[in-house]
A protein has these predicted regions:
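Long, ordered, helix-rich scaffold segments
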Residues: 1-173
Length: 173
């Protein structure tokens, strides 16, 4: 049902509000599958409404932040050694969706974790599962210094994943 709400609205078989109501009702669900589908559908909605007035786009992002922000705060950026793959995927999905929506807490935490990397190349606060999100959001919400720090990751990557993540981050800016 999570995957069908928005396609039904796109096809004219239901209203977008029905899909939004479903997403709101499912917020806080701890299933990675449900949250992945919700993030994908709400991300698509935000993307296709780019031509709408700024107030509408801001409203969609506030809604997305309301759906994913509380769970991002609950799960935190801290990965445990015994976290299941389901929990790791859930954390990555929720934090990425909250950041994409402009959730203040999530973006502040990204800035805090990016700062040591920017200042002296220290990746210790950035879990590999969140590297792409942290770099992308640092570039998106940062300035030239953040962009240059991510370009530094690209030029001297610790791993291939670092180089790929930095390319995605610079390309998404």
């Amino acid at each position: 049902e999570v995957c069908a709400g928005f396609p039904r609205a796109q096809g004219g078989y239901s209203k977008t509000a029905c899909g939004l109501s479903l997403m709101h009702a499912l917020r806080g669900d701890n299933s990675s599958l449900v949250n992945t589908a919700a993030a994908l559908n709400l991300g698509k909605l935000a993307s296709v409404w780019w031509e709408q007035p700024q107030s509408v786009r801001d409203g969609i992002n506030r809604f997305r932040a309301d759906v994913f922000g509380p769970m991002a705060r609950e799960l935190t950026f801290e990965f445990g050694a015994n976290d299941s793959s389901e929990l790791r995927e859930l954390r990555e999905t929720v934090i990425t969706a909250a950041a994409s929506a402009g959730d203040t807490w999530t973006l502040d935490e990204i800035r805090r974790r990016f700062a040591p990397l920017q200042e002296h190349g220290d990746y210790s606060l950035i879990h590999p599962d969140l590297l792409r999100t942290v770099l992308s959001q640092a570039v998106k919400h940062g300035r030239e210094a953040e962009y240059e720090a991510v370009m530094g990751v690209y030029r001297a990557p610790a791993t291939q994943a670092h180089q790929t993540s930095s390319m995605v981050a610079v390309g998404a800016s």
